[in-house]
Amino acid sequence: MIQKIKKDWPDHWKIILESNNEKAPMWLRVNPKKITANKYIDMIASENNVSKSNLGYIGDCKYSVCLKNPIQIDSLPMFYDGYVSIQDGAAQLAVECLLNGKDGRILDACAAPGGKTGQILENIVESSQLTAIEIDPLRAKLIDQNLERLGYKKDILINDLNDIESWWDSEFFDLILLDAPCSSSGVIRRHPDIKHLRKVSDISAYHKKQLKILNSLWSTLSKNGRMIYVTCSLFREENDDVINQFKKKHDNVAHGDLLLNNNIKKQMIKTEYGYQVLPGIMNMDGFYFACLEKKN
């Protein structure tokens, strides 16, 4: 794994390895339908008798708070009332990239454990239609639990994404979020066991799985629709290489821009087909984002 990181990131591998050994901060996503990020961090500071400056700061991604030191869930005000969720800042960016002022028919693919599903519901109008799909029944229950805490009721489809006929109603999606299964090499600081469990051969297997899902879902996207392809991987084989192979098969793929605020984008690394957040940059986990739009 280290050799592969060195190969893919010859100018950044040292900072990647250092960041993977550091303690990760605690990121929160505030529910904008219930409270603002500023008011919520004030509430945490007050209830935990900590100064706001020592507690953390408002993140650059919308409705985010980064705590310098993790605190117990029971110490998070109104957590069980759906005011806030625990979700890394980079993961929050995926939904920002997806919605960006648009709505309509939305698909959250590979939806478990439901963080992004909840974030979508917190940021769309009632007329939008969200479909969430997950192949693992046990992980689908996690989505139900997360949404129940946030005050939402949503039927989760338990299906294989590649078996399109088993779950798709033939109505095209305007927006698709594909948070693809991956090596999780960008979140090692949160899950250090990955360093010992993941093998280089796993990367090729993930590449094939990611490409298959991407090809399957493309047929369900409307003309002029937007798909955000996301992984928490650092490896080109799971990121740009997947998009490159995908483009060879489809001639109706256009690259959309990630319409994020400039302070975030200037800290991301522009790749051939997307953007990479390296672990530790902006205090976030390592994530890759590519915006794909279907040509009319």
What is the predicted role of each segment?
Residues 1-296:
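S-adenosylmethionine
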